[in-house]
Swiss-Prot record:
GO terms for molecular function: collagen binding; fibronectin binding; integrin binding; laminin binding; protease binding; protein domain specific binding; protein heterodimerization activity. The keyword Transport does not apply. Heterodimer of an alpha and a beta subunit. The alpha subunit is composed of a heavy and a light chain linked by a disulfide bond. Alpha-3 associates with beta-1. Interacts with HPS5. Interacts with FAP (seprase); the interaction occurs at the cell surface of invadopodia membrane in a collagen-dependent manner. GO terms for cellular component: anchoring junction; basolateral plasma membrane; excitatory synapse; external side of plasma membrane; filopodium membrane; glutamatergic synapse; growth cone filopodium; integrin alpha3-beta1 complex. Residues 865-890 are annotated as: Disordered. Disulfide bonds join 94-103, 140-162, 185-197, 486-491, 497-551, 616-622, 695-704, 848-906, 913-918. This is Integrin alpha-3. Its main location: membrane. Keywords: Cell adhesion, Cell junction, Cell membrane, Cell projection, Cleavage on pair of basic residues, Disulfide bond, Glycoprotein, Integrin, Lipoprotein, Membrane, Palmitate, Receptor, Repeat, Signal, Transmembrane, Transmembrane helix. Isoform 1 and isoform 2 are expressed in heart and brain. Only isoform 1 is detected in lung. It comes from Mus musculus (Mouse).
Amino acid sequence: MGPGPCRVPRAPGWLLRALALMVAACGRVAFAFNLDTRFLVVKEAVNPGSLFGYSVALHRQTERQQRYLLLAGAPRDLAVGDDYTNRTGAVYLCPLTAHKDDCERMDISEKSDPDHHIIEDMWLGVTVASQGPAGRVLVCAHRYTKVLWSGLEDQRRMVGKCYVRGNDLQLDPGDDWQTYHNEMCNSNTDYLQTGMCQLGTSGGFTQNTVYFGAPGAYNWKGNSYMIQRKDWDLSEYSYRGSEEQGNLYIGYTVQVGNAILHPTDIITVVTGAPRHQHMGAVFLLKQESGGDLQRKQVLKGTQVGAYFGSAIALADLNNDGWQDLLVGAPYYFERKEEVGGAVYVFMNQAGASFPDQPSLLLHGPSRSAFGISIASIGDINQDGFQDIAVGAPFEGLGKVYIYHSSSGGLLRQPQQIIHGEKLGLPGLATFGYSLSGKMDVDENLYPDLLVGSLSDHIVLLRARPVINILHRTLVARPAVLDPALCTATSCVQVELCFAYNQSAGNPNYRRNITLAYTLEADRDRRPPRLRFARSQSSVFHGFFSMPETHCQTLELLLMDNVRDKLRPIVIAMNYSLPLRMPDRLKLGLRSLDAYPVLNQAQAMENHTEVHFQKECGPDNKCDSNLQMRAAFLSEQLQPLSRLQYSRDTKKLFLSINVTNSPSSQRAGEDAHEALLTLEVPSALLLSSVRPSGTCQANNETILCELGNPFKRNQRMELLIAFEVIGVTLHTRDLPVLLQLSTSSHQDNLQPVLLTLQVDYTLQASLSLMNHRLQSFFGGTVMGEAAMKTAEDVGSPLKYEFQVSPVGDGLAALGTLVLGLEWPYEVTNGKWLLYPTEITIHSNGSWPCQPSGNLVNPLNLTLSDPGVTPLSPQRRRRQLDPGGDQSSPPVTLAAAKKAKSETVLTCSNGRARCVWLECPLPDTSNITNVTVKARVWNSTFIEDYKDFDRVRVDGWATLFLRTSIPTINMENKTTWFSVDIDSELVEELPAEIELWLVLVAVGAGLLLLGLIILLLWKCGFFKRARTRALYEAKRQKAEMKSQPSETERLTDDY
């Protein structure tokens, strides 16, 4: 029975967080991977300026003593013990110590002999290679020079030379490998053959083969040489290609290996030619009988001057048993992309060939010389795949990029970048110029990396152990939570367990390791629904010590008022390995077992879920069926297909019906956290919602909570009222985006776009200050040709129209136009009302000139528009000049004669009209339009002298001219009129002659005398007597009554 859960001592949450922060602050958590940059082995040149580190190699010495050595070439180092030579170059062997200056010079017993050879500046150490564990060492000097015919006619041949030394770096005369001359070039030929071959520019070992590159052979076409030993047999091979041109530099770099283009027992030579056709190439050469290397394939570069092929490396990147090829092009560039240097990765096609195009192209930053060095460094993280190092020595102080591989080949992104400037080494520059790996020098089962430079420094980077975390279990109990069963101290219990092993598989690696972990409840939701009992928050920080501790258990509590009970609560865990690393560089070979790193290929997090108990079927999964219908309504709550908008439009309604009913495709179960989201335009402002409190507005977003849950077969109708506040002339429609959402399962909820088309109705008004004017005609007839001024035409008229603004500026969308149906002439073609000028007043004044030259067509001189005074012999026949002008005035002529009047309009056919248009300005102010005209006096005298009054009518219309179909305006029309009266001429009485007066008086007196005489004759002047008067009175007094006519008639019968 296994051990039970182990509980850690309780500690306050703040203390645990403080500890985590303290560990992180005091130590450095490895952000890269497992090449250590704090515990370094650094070696410096004995003689500065010697290019110590130009070439490097890791070597394991097993003869005479057991030790690992760092080999460094210094091709510009000073000569030793030779009076004829200043510089020869050297190779140094450096032990793994904390000292920088304890390297020893390798003994190469080559003495100067100017008559036979020159070793001055021969660049000894340009190439350094180790044969591997218990193997030999190869050292080359590619500028070693042979002297022919010394004296005045001496000739020199820079053929180069390589030296092989034993495992202890000493010369063993009994070893054929070391005593063989290794001079593959014939110094008796000139540069067109092998007289300038520069053997040793590159070279290396296999178990039974030593190989060299000679890029100067054959006029610098170059060549590659290989010496193979099998038992007691020795075979020499060289490439005799058909290339005739020079300057290819074949052999600039060389690698030899098996399982490249042939099975494991056949060798393939891979050699670079960085100047092939100016773009570089890599030759793959097959070993043939007779000592020839036969060309099998050529991989060509893609950019002129990139130096493709100047560095190559072989490694089985995908573990398919075949070696893959990496080729450097350090001077590759892409100006726009800021790229400088490239590495081409060619994946082996199971021994058949390599593809012509790279499977992967890695780039470095501009001017970095990325790819000038490439090395297969072994499996530094022990994940089962080979890793690669690429140098970029001119990026800052130099960088080394570490790439891991997988079953798919090399990974595109580097797993670690070592920065030269961050190593803290004074004087270090061009870090990464040379590389050597594939050897575990501190014997921790992880291969290490030696990095050289041109600044007289070499640096050993050792690999730290990699830890695999096992059994990263995180279990929550119960998995289905019933809130009713929670207590005050526990609701959910979480158990986490860890174990580890070393990636290299060392069973004895049992270091005490403490993981720092973080648990977070409901990480993707705020506010969280669970909290840890110990930290009183949704986050808990803790530590886990291994291998002693196996598991820990933590209690969680449920928050109050949890709404979301549909989605599970995710409890996430992540962990790290905080280590206390030194802040400063520590030199020496200190063990790195105490500083492991976590395997970055593993996920450093885990999670588990806690579900709420729900009534959503046996699978505890709610399958809802929310459906929605929506429509716009008018203010009268009638369906609205288009909005006829005007400034009087205040409200707009949106009706939404939401249902959750079962269907044949969906179960229609409860919809948890059902929500309706509306995205409305800025022209609509939320006013009210029915039912109230359902929706909340946030700028242009409206959120409506439908229910939690919105139950099966539930229906809801929303009536949302908007205030229409921002509709402009540019508004064509009002789009509203409606989106239903729920935390239940429903994958067919798509947004619905509801669009209401808008017709904008402008509101403007047209008014006339005086609809009915009065004027007159009279006088004499004047011909049109005789008229010079407007006063010659007749009496003046003045109409003043007023237009109120439309509110929104029309700008380029349209124009308001005032049109006049103007009574221009009578039916016989004579002038009627002669327009003299039209003026528009709004933020200034300007004339209106309708088309057709209809305003003042005779170009008469205009005068003061005031009323023309009457002549002394004329007066207006108006009885009540202060009376109401809107009713027909009563004139003197009408009072006396009441003669008839006539009406002239275009509608009754008695007048002819023309159409005058005046575009009005786009302004927010009131616009006034003044129309001035003259009554054509001659026409009225000639044709209407028999009428006491003539009335002339016209019409004015305000309308909108636009090409936008959604903008309209109701035409505004008003009438205008003028009453034109004829004038009364009063003639004064003439003087009468005196004699006529006297005759008339005399005749009157004679007539009066005759009348008096006649009356006298008739007794008119006689007086009655007194008695007769009295009798008459008495008789009259006695009379009672006179009989009627009827009585008289009856009395006669």
